[in-house]
């Protein structure tokens, strides 16, 4: 019964957008546990009272949740004493692994000194001031002028839209308000950031997306490249489509374009060659701002301090979160270029104040932990470590790409996804009820490794502190789980015949 329910849950995330096919729209199933392993029917589980994010209702009544009690380095330990290699670093975020003593000390010291003070009305604490300076110094792809603090990446992206609107209103352009995002990208789950997310499941039954949000092509060459179309030609076509969309809507109405350097939660999709070069040319032509969502790619994930460094992105605004504090405490940030921050400054003087903020904006404990995290990234040269170790990770996993059940393995740095496909074709998915990725995830879990299952894919984004030995162990478990999954798929194929 649970397997049927789980298939229905995965299927509920299917849907179509302008750029998604029947197969690609299957991606955003967010259940990471397998009913084959976690079913608690008949064992006395009474359910729980938490309305859990991205979780089907029946999970809270039929499935005992995986309860993680502690972490150490790249590993987490559940309530039953099982040890797992956490290949998603929580939710793409515990970059420095579990229980880093320097971060714990930074939090404790700040809690003892000043557990909270706000940043309203020209009052603040020292940690947010210091952190803002550090972030402006650290982000070098383009000069930034100011930093606004939030509590999450969702809030950061939400705030970006408000800043863009405020900016255009100040310049006397009240109609320049539309935001263009990519189909299949994920930007958060607030009202605005969920609208920006190009995933049907984020919109279904929520009356989203908001009418001011438009979506353009997903830059996934393997899935959407035309027969005989080179990667650079694919990028040109997508840039042309973006330009046509801007012209159709009217450049005077389009305010900004938002993109991750590498699409993360929407499927781990690195951009095709020349993509951002061509996209930025279009944006500059029509005076459209570029918001770089670096929530996942920031602080070394791709082997550079920021994804913008790797892909030569020159954004006007930047969103940060997750690894900003290695997820030890909630914090996000928006970086704003001087061209925009100067206008915001001037407009706020005319109005009387900048009327946007949160109680916890620049929380001193969060900022103190983030400051220590930034010190560690620099002192240990985490981007260089990722650059050194990521070939072992990428090549180790991609060595299995010839498997008959793998359609594509893609990634960069310590960010990777494997997409399962029948006959290795992007247009020939496995039947939903087979739950191929779920089977793989369950086999990994049996062997002491957690991966994220996303529809027909599994995703990995391990802690940036992983050792070569841990990478080798990850690759070994991946291979064993793949072999077991191939055997199960062979059984399912034979039954289907």
Curated annotation (Swiss-Prot):
Protein name per its UniProtKB record: Probable gamma-aminobutyrate transaminase 2, mitochondrial
InterPro entries attached to this UniProt entry: Aminotrans_3, Aminotrans_3_PPA_site, PyrdxlP-dep_Trfase, PyrdxlP-dep_Trfase_major, PyrdxlP-dep_Trfase_small
Record-listed substrate binding positions: 186, 322
Protein source organism: Oryza sativa subsp. indica
Subcellular location: Mitochondrion
NCBIfam families linked: PRK06105.1
Transit peptide feature range: 1-37
CDD domains linked to this entry: OAT_like (cd00610)
Entry superkingdom: Eukaryota
Residues carrying N6-(pyridoxal phosphate)lysine: 322
Record-level Gene Ontology MF annotations: 4-aminobutyrate:pyruvate transaminase activity; adenosylmethionine-8-amino-7-oxononanoate transaminase activity; pyridoxal phosphate binding
Family (UniProt): Belongs to the class-III pyridoxal-phosphate-dependent aminotransferase family.
GO biological process, one term: biotin biosynthetic process
EC supergroup of this enzyme: transferase
Cellular-component GO terms for this entry: mitochondrion
């Amino acid at each position: 019964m649970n397997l049927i329910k789980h298939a229905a849950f995965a299927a509920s995330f299917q849907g179509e957008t302008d750029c998604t096919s029947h197969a690609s729209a299957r991606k955003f199933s967010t259940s990471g546990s397998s009913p084959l392993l976690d079913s608690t029917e008949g064992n006395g589980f009474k359910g729980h009272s938490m309305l859990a994010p991205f979780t089907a209702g029946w999970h809270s009544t039929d499935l005992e949740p995986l309860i993680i009690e502690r972490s150490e380095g790249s590993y987490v330990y559940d309530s039953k004493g099982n040890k797992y290699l956490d290949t998603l670093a929580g939710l793409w975020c515990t970059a420095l692994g579990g229980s880093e003593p320097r971060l714990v000390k930074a939090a404790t010291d700040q809690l003892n000194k000043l557990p909270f003070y706000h940043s309203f009305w020209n009052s603040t604490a020292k940690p947010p001031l210091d952190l803002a300076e550090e972030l402006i110094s650290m982000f070098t792809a383009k000069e930034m002028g100011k930093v606004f603090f939030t509590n999450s990446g969702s809030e950061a992206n939400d705030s970006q839209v408000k800043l863009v609107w405020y900016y255009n209103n100040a310049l006397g352009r009240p109609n320049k308000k539309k935001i263009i995002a990519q189909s299949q990208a994920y930007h958060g789950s607030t009202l605005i950031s969920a609208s920006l997310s190009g995933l049907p499941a984020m919109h279904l039954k929520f009356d989203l997306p908001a009418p001011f949000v438009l979506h353009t092509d997903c830059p996934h060459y393997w899935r959407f490249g035309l027969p005989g179309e080179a990667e650079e030609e694919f990028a040109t076509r997508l840039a042309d489509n973006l330009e046509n969309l801007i012209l159709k809507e009217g450049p005077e109405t389009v305010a900004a374009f938002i993109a991750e350097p590498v699409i993360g939660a929407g499927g781990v999709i690195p951009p095709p060659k020349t993509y951002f070069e061509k996209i930025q040319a279009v944006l500059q032509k029509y005076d459209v701002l570029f918001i770089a969502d670096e929530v996942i790619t920031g602080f070394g994930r791709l082997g550079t301090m920021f994804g913008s460094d790797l892909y030569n992105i020159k954004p006007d605004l930047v969103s940060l979160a997750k690894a900003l504090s290695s997820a030890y405490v909630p914090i996000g940030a928006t970086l704003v270029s001087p061209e925009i921050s100067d206008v915001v400054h001037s407009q706020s003087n005319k109005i009387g104040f900048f009327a946007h903020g949160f109680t916890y904006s620049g929380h001193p404990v969060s900022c103190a932990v983030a400051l220590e995290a930034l010190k560690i990234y620099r002192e240990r040269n985490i981007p260089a470590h990722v650059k050194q170790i990521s070939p072992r990770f990428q090549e180790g996993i991609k060595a299995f790409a010839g498997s008959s059940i793998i359609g594509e393995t893609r990634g960069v740095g310590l960010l990777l996804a494997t997409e399962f496909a029948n006959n290795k074709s992007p247009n020939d998915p496995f039947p939903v009820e087979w739950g191929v990725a779920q089977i793989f995830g369950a086999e990994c879990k049996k062997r002491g490794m957690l991966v994220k299952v996303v529809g027909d894919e599994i995703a990995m984004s391990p802690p940036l502190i992983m050792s070569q030995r841990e990478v080798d162990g990850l690759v070994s478990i991946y291979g064993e789980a793949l072999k077991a999954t191939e055997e199960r798929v062979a059984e399912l194929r034979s039954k289907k015949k």
